[in-house]
Amino acid sequence: MLIKFLKHTGAAQDGQPGDPDARLAIDYLQGEMVLKPERAGSPKVWIKRATAPIPISGHAWLISQTCAALPFQHRYASGVIAFDRHDIDIAAWTGGDVALRGLTDALMRDFEDTAFAGIPEEHRPEVLWNAHTDKRRLELNFLFARAVLDSQGRLKAINP
């Protein structure tokens, strides 16, 4: 298992415009078609994923609106928890295997508890979780606004 935070934060980078409402990142997480290079160094083209993304939890519209309302340059964090092909049986997981789903649900909960350590649940940002299985392994993708509510109800930037 590998946990990776991605460089995408909503800020403009490498000559590319920003994604202040996280819409591009959300579209990547949820889309059946993705913009990727066919080969290393080649221009990006629209490619259909081998399998459609699987929504797990979170409300994309709420996260997008939250990110759009933030006054920060880096408005969201995104990443992936990727498993080796031999760690999780994709067919069983996508079929709803109770034990495997329980395992990944607990892992996502533990990840959130670690990422937001010390922050009460009611002050944490909503997390969008989607699964990708198009690489013949399970990938749990996450995205959340980089802000929490303080005890006075004000938004404060966080850096997970």
Regions found by a protein language model. Name each.
Residues 1-160:
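N-terminal nicking endonuclease/strand-transfer module with a His-rich metal-binding environment
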